[in-house]
Amino acid sequence: MSSVAITICILSLVASLGLWLGNIKIRGVGLSIGGVLFGGIIISHIMNLPTVASFMQQKNIVLDSQTLYFVQEFGLILFVYTIGIQVGPGFFASLRSSGLKLNAFAALIVLLGGLCSVILYYLFSIPLPAILGILSGAVTNTPSLGAGKQIIAELGGEQMTELMGMGYAIAYPFGIIGVLLAMWLIRLIFKIRPERELQFFDKEQQRQKGLAGINIRITNPNINNILLREIPDYDLNTVIYSRLKRNDELIIPHPNTTLYLNDILHLVGNKKSLNKMQIILGEEAGHEPLNSGDSPIKNERAVVTNEQVCGKKLAQLQIQSQYDVVISRINRAGVELIPSDEMALQFGDVLHLVGRQKNIATVLSLIGNAQQKLQQVQMLPVFIGIGLGVLLGSIPIYLPGFPVALKLGLAGGPLVVALVLARIGSIGKLYWFMPPSANLALREIGIVLFLSVIGIHAGEHFFSTLLSKDGFSWICYGAIITLLPLLIAGIIARYYSKMNYLTICGLLAGAMTDTPALAFANAIQENNGASVLAYATVYPLTTFLRIMLPQLIAVLLWAAH
């Protein structure tokens, strides 16, 4: 049996044991994917026991170091790339309004964690690889560990990277528990009732909801007997006129449709734009879409799956003028958008269509609406994206005063490229849409491979370090790095910014890129969308900062000696 085959068998054993450990939960909290790390540590520890090591030597059972290295790096690449593809479209949209505040708090948590690490490093003379590993474990961030190992190796400390894995593993358990503890302490300090927080959040969401619909009866005599396109601000594309009801007849309005008093228009847009149009046109006549029992006008949702229309602007497709169908709104990666002539369609866009059933059917055949295509993965863009990400990660970034160039590395490069490509959506016939199930599968495979190798490398000396004086100290250092930044940011967010508690919980989980903590935050109050929204908003920027932070710390502290 070759060393490569033996290595793959051992990795499979580690992954199986680790995933089983991760599924064990105590009061709803478990190691989750972090169990793979401890599966690797256990297997590695057993393999290094004198009797087992002697037996393996006799039977010539050895692990192939090159295979382990490749599996570790490729697993990391898969993990960060799929994260970028998943959150890319929503990330740029989330940077508006409240997203800026949330990301500022997330950046504060990251920077405070780095500051705590540097202070502990100088106070207690902790080895540099160890404090970087403790930092990564304390914030439960695997890409951070990968970036730290890479920069330490490039600085000439490749032999010391094992310390990083041990520091990561020792600090990791409290990294998970510490986030939950911070959420509980903030709730206790401010005497918060989660059910009231959910009510406040729901009210705020209704007030700020992206797009809404309204019926407006034309009572302004200045609008009587003019064309739809002559309405003030029509060309700004801030609202969509999806239906017109005249007496008992329901029709699709066109730019050249003549308007009369007592006509009722159904408009779609943000609340500010709708209020403005109400002042111009007349009085509100309800919010429900206009319907008539025997009307042929229907509405339907359809998904863009035809590669021929991906990347084409709505002006080129002329859907309203040719097919008498209105696109009232477009849902892209969970973000609702007002259609405009200059907007280009992307694979996976969900269109809200209004028109006659026969005309809608024609539009459906044009845009695709093939649900099975949403389950297919186009592999060519995946490898193009990974290749571009690795190239970007290899470009040196020279900063004044730094002895070596920084790099985005194998963790940062693919992440940045994936975010950008997911935002672009498609180039020609290449589209970067990935079905959620496929994305999750690749992401889980990547993180399992990476953590399996990290665990194997860390396992040889893990238990001896854990049971030593250093082991207990490292746990304490990790607890400080975990808890202090979270409490400071959480208290500031609540006391000064009056941030919703459920949003704070999502912020803390996202700033630590901690999925188990998000699950805990969701369990605080059922049907809680606040935590998920905050988590998704800060996750991409946090991951990027977590990747860059250990590199900055490593270069600065290495140069200081």
Swiss-Prot record:
On the tree of life, the source organism's domain of life is: Bacteria
Write out the GO biological process terms: potassium ion transport
Which residue ranges does the record assign to the RCK C-terminal domain?
198-283, 285-369
The portions of this protein that span the membrane are 4-24, 29-49, 74-94, 104-124, 166-186, 379-399, 411-433, 447-467, 472-492, 501-521, 538-558
Q: InterPro entries, per this entry?
A: AAE_transporter, RCK_C, RCK_C_sf, Transpt_YidE_put, YidE_YbjL
Q: Which family would the database say this protein is a member of?
A: Belongs to the AAE transporter (TC 2.A.81) family. YidE subfamily.
In its keyword annotation, does this UniProt entry include Cell membrane?
yes
A single GO CC term, please? plasma membrane
Query: Where, per UniProt, does this protein localize?
Result: Cell membrane
* Membrane topology according to the record: Multi-pass membrane protein
Signal sequence annotation: none
- Which of UniProt's keywords are assigned here? Cell membrane, Membrane, Repeat, Transmembrane, Transmembrane helix, Transport
**Protein name, as recorded:** Putative transport protein DNO_0009
What GO MF terms are annotated? monoatomic cation transmembrane transporter activity
